[in-house]
Amino acid sequence: LHSSPKVTAPLPLWDMLEGTAPRGLLGLSDPNVHRVGDRWSLFVGGFSTSFRNRLYRADLPAGEDVRLTGWRLRTTAGGRPVPLVPDPPRGSWDAGGMHTPCYVPPHRGAPARVYYAGRRGRRHYGPGSAYAVGVLEQRPDGSWSRAAHPVATGTPDRPSALEPAVVPVADGYRMWFLSAPHEVGPGEQPDFELRASDSPDGIVWSRPRTFASRREGFFDTALYHGPDGWTMLLARGTDLHGTSPFPEQGLWAMRADTPSADRADWSPPVRVLDTGAPATPRWMGRGVCGPSVARTADGGLLVFFTGTHDSRSWWREAAARIAALRRPPVPAPYFLATGGARLEPAGRAGR
């Protein structure tokens, strides 16, 4: 028997609608939190004021315990956010932008890496949007280099591979990723399938196999290890465009003794967050995605994620703020907020 976690006390950190993104950025999404050396670091995707999707890093002060607040984005002396790497060359497979970082520490003689979803063209969503999984490797001086080619791509019937979640295992690396025709556009229903793949070196990957079906509709995942085994959190990707009807949103949890790529080794998914519940904060009212879990020094768990605001059109949001003598939000088709919550044990779930 394993305890089922419960998400409590959600808190936004960076919010597009409220204008709390750091200077030089319009929004941040898909946080990935790890202890790196003497400090906690948060790798995150960001949309710059120059309209570029880049990867960034925020930190807590050295020696401090992980918490939801107090993260400082790495910046220049002038206060401008510093991306992990320069923009990809024009015409490259990820020239449209870099999203959804996943940090993996040094393993089996390989350096630290950041896997990410690279977008080919300008389209973020809908037919014609296309993604593949790429990787950055850390140099001895701490800087990052971008691999010229993707490590995972789609198939003719499902051209996009995105949302990588990579963990080191005894014989190499294991990756879960989203297989989809494209990112969901306005009025569309999601067509999501999670797949799993293995690699001895983290670069050349095995033929992927289905881990979660299209019927289940999971968009991305995060794994963490605890005293009673492994937990996988799964999200459905959020209702970006306010489409109705749309699959129920939130977070689900499964348990296993090992980070197995075989779905039969995992318990049935149990819903641990219902973002359709009446008390849900508005900043995550249309669902959450990009989960990442960190353990505090006293054994508590924090889950970081990105929520989609249950918002009105930009025009209506802007009018309401102007009427209240507040600055209007940045023009956007939807509004994201990145934050987190506590992940508390609650109840028991059987395997």
Task: Please provide the spans of the model-predicted regions.
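Intrinsically disordered, low-complexity, Lys/Arg-biased terminal tails
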Residues: 286-288
